[in-house]
Amino acid sequence: MIVKIWDVIEGPIAAAECPEEGPEEANWYMVCRAEVDGIIADDNFWFEDFDDAYEWQKHFMKTIEPLIIDMSVMAGYN
């Protein structure tokens, strides 16, 4: 499954501040505008490391091009 991230709406935010439970190893999350199969919605994306999350934030400070993630190659997703 291909996910396109179009924008960071909010974050990085400490995972402890999230009302929903995320992955056990996640310390940070961001609310992002994402597209899956042509449908766009805001969703939470989880990160172990603040710097990894902030890389997404920096991407959108420079460009409006989406980040493209192939979830089929990520552990725990199919």
Regions found by a protein language model. Name each.
Residues M1-Y29, D70-M71:
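Short N-terminal "domain-start" leader segments
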Residues E21-N44:
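A short, structured beta-strand/loop element
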